[in-house]
Amino acid sequence: MQINKPDNTLQNISVGSKEINAARVAFFLPGFVISTWAPMIPMVKARLKLEADVLGRLLLCIGISAFIFMPLAGALVQRFGCKKVVITGATLMALISVLLSCLQNIWSYAIALAFFVAVMGATDVSMNTNAVIVEKLAGRRLLSGMHAFWSIGCFASAGLFSVLASSGSNVTLIATLHCAIVLALLAVFGRHLLDYKIPGGEKAFAIPRGIVIVLGILACISFLVEGAVMDWSGVLLTEVKNMDIALAGTGYAIFSVAMLIMRLLGDKTVQFLGEQKAVIGGSIVTAAGFALVVVLDNLYLNAFAFILIGLGCANIVPVFYSLLKYQKGMPISAAVTSVTSLGYTGVILGPALLGFVAHGINISAVFELVALLLVIEAGIAKYVFCKLKM
């Protein structure tokens, strides 16, 4: 069944099950490729003989390159459309991941990695633009489930990488097989991505303003939350809670699984609760999880706290993207570009900010600060929904 939306800019686009599945695959592929590259980092560190601080600075600079390039993604969508940008971006990411597996020089590796992350930024913007439009035209909630497919891609890639590596396959062969999977999925689903372009006369890039900049700031806080669990949960469990080093990764693993499950259930959950309750309630639940992690010392109670964090924050970012379809101040792709760019400041600057807090005060203060930011996020979100009159 095809569902048509009578909109002046979208009247020639129809959405059915093929377009919805293609949008899900558009999220799966970048997650799949990123989790192909991530396990290579220790191998690359050893092969290029990099010290930890050099590797850290390299990764920070690469992250900044994505942030700089991301605002140009709207222009790419305007000129070429969502379909071409997603297909080209996912293809280049897969091919570059193979290149990253075999480069022997730090400078060539840095250039290739910078290009990889820049392409990832453009793909991120275009896939979210495609998803927002698909949800708008379909007339039902879809974004939480689509974001779940990013996580599914990460899990699938990491699992396949581990199986192949344990069987003795070298990293270049593994990356090549992963690349082939990406290209095969693009061949099947890529043609059903939306060929949406920004209408003539509308700017592809605009300085974020009004409700869009507020949503971008909220997205920044939400990305910072995910980064805090990823970067600092292991340190908290081992150094503050005095747990065995073997348990260092349990917090992030529990958080990731809880987030994935809730995102798979997220569209129906948000539809039942409403967007406002899902965001504000999710922020409060997540803040409670961070507070409990600080005060509880039992392994199982800490696991419960990380479950709360994963469940609470799972649907916040998808709802922020979904809200962009209600605003009238900017074209959808420009609004998505703005929110994504501002959100990624939490990924890029968050680890450094939290590191200063951990060094200047203590590690527990990192989680206390994030809990406070989440309470502030809930208050600002209330203002956003009032402005949108929802």
Please report, for each region that a protein language model flagged, where it lies by residue.
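Intracellular juxtamembrane helix-capping segments at the cytosolic ends
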Residues: G121-K136, N315-K328
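Helix-breaking motifs and short loop linkers at transmembrane-helix boundaries and internal kinks
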Residues: K49, G81, C102-W107, N242, ...
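Primarily marks hydrophobic transmembrane alpha-helices of the MFS/SLC 12-helix fold
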Residues: K83-V86, V279
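C-terminal ends and interior cores of transmembrane alpha-helices
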Residues: T91-Q104, V285-D297
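Short amphipathic helix-loop junctions that connect adjacent transmembrane helices
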Residues: P39-D53, D231-L247
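Symmetry-related core transmembrane helices of the 12-TM Major Facilitator Superfamily/SLC fold
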Residues: T172-G190, F367-Y383
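C-terminal transmembrane helical hairpin of 12-TM major facilitator-type secondary transporters
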Residues: Q276-F320
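Helix-to-loop junctions at the C-terminal end of transmembrane segments
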Residues: F69-G81, A165, M262-G274, A358-H359
